[in-house]
Amino acid sequence: MAKRKRKQNLIYLLLIFIVGAVIGTIWFHSHFTREVSNSYSVNETATLNSGAKVYNSLSAIQRVSLPEQVTVKVNRYYLTSANKNKETFARINYNGKNYFVRTTDIELKMDNTINNYLNQSGLPHAKITKQISSIFEQRGYSTSSGNPRGVVIHDTGNENTTINSEVSYMKQNYSSTQVFVHTFIDNQQILNIADTKYMAEGAGPNANPYFVQFEMPHEYTAASFANEVGNAAYYTAYILKQNNLPVTKGTKDGGGTVWTHAMVSSYLGGTDHQDPVSYWSTSARKLFDTSYTINDFVELVQAYYNEM
């Protein structure tokens, strides 16, 4: 009788152990396993911030010690979620081995003069101000999710105008032109005038149903031009982050999330505008004695994105 009771107790203990192990495994995976919603390859150089937490895998089971503020290569980004917490991780390579680190723990090296100017200034940006107008038609995006899949960049093409004058003109002529964008950006403002939950009508029928769009008035000093570009990069990063999208340049097959109006004309059609190519290149050459292209802008967007 006593032997049977001891056997039953052992069985109970074994069952308790098994149940505990299962619960522990479920708890561990819910708290430490990261689900990757998207990833994309890059070729960047960065510096580890002081106190950066470096891991040997995305599951973050084991911390790794690397020299502080060491230079590393960034070869991939991962958009992850764990326990309802969304974070972006960078896969870095140091001495031939890959590690993982939160993007807030690295600082990208900027090759372009304008990007470097902004980086050394701490990546400044204006706050987003909303003055949503009710006059613009609200139509949903044509994506399966109902959300935008990227951002299209415009410049106004007009000299010596301001955000206020451009917005006034767009509103006054909307009934006849049926053209509008979501947001206007200059060196001091990020002014959102149309709800980004709905499509804009500024880049032709092949782009409008898919992208958030913004316009940039022209700036004429080095500081104001750089700050406008910085605000534009911040806003682009904000929209992409808000919609859980990667930072990738638009491609001929329609992929990618960061587009100029000129790229829409070349790759998607339905429009023939070439902005902001000339505005960027002319201003960069005149004000900074350098060049500025969509590749430089994507690099800057990633820097702002990494801080979010």
Predicted regions and their residues:
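Short coil-to-beta-strand
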Residues: 205-214
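Beta-loop motif signature
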Residues: 27-89, 93
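Solvent-exposed, acidic/flexible segments
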Residues: 85, 146, 160, 176, ...
